[in-house]
């Protein structure tokens, strides 16, 4: 998934910058479809898929798609800017971060409701299984709490209303977010 995302980000860098709003809309529609897909799955519906669609939905639902975008965004911070590939990838760091957040929301939604629907079984657990479930849920909720302000302030319209210093200090919370994602993985 990560190699595919890097290739897309590199080869379509100019288009991502130029058509970012349209890409956000398409990404949001796909994410909404994934959330609806999750609702059907959690309610026990059997779904017939077109070839490749099941894997695509699974990539979004599992968090792999959003995670791949976040990995790229995270590593862009250490790219050496003297290389053309680094400059080309980094020119859309904010846009790719927004896309990552949009693709992560279905994953968050699925596992939040799966946890709630499965809470009767989780309370019966003890030891490591209970601790693991509670830790994963807590880390996820904490990560979402950090991700949402970062997501909102990544939009140029919002970012322009903030001072550079305030925006940069808020963006430092991204490192905590990455740590929470690491805990979950």
Language-model regions: role of each:
Residues 1-185:
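Membrane-embedded alpha-helical bundles that constitute the cytochrome b-like, heme-associated redox core
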